[in-house]
Amino acid sequence: PGVLEAVARDLEREDFRTFRETGYLLRATYTLDMAEVSASLTEMALAFGRQDLAEKLAGLDRHWRNAFDGDGLMRADSEYYEGNRWNYSFRPVRHQEERMALCGGKEGYVNLLDRFFGFTHPEDVSARFEGFNNETDMEAPYAYHAAGRRDRLCRILDTADRQVFRASSGGTGRGGIPGNND
């Protein structure tokens, strides 16, 4: 109840009003965040019987598409923090099948992932997975799971386990969290 009142107030803030009216915010990442939050808040409002809030939020989760360009990557004209459009393009979203369709389907999505992780074009390091030391990249390997390529996911996680997390190979060791400087 107190939380729902805070949600109602937040819906009237300028940035959220802008999001409701235009479907986009200054940064593509923030647009994606707000779309995901909108879906969660809609569910919460309905669970607590606040149809009025649910109606204000209804459909805003669809604005996630506005964070992406036609090539299936996040918008090139956006600013990014601790990364670039590649680093943020493989975050999980609620509408994962539609997300993959932006890339031409699962095959196109996997092709972008393969490039990002260096399975193809190993010489091109301009748009590359930076590792588990960068929080913007930590979710990215799991995009392979959504695309049905658990083999690739396991390969990345196995490699990370051996090279990053095990003290015997120079990693941080058991319980280590590389790059967690926040």
Language model segments and positions:
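Active-site core of glycosidic bond-cleaving carbohydrate-active enzymes
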Residues: G2-R62, N66-D182
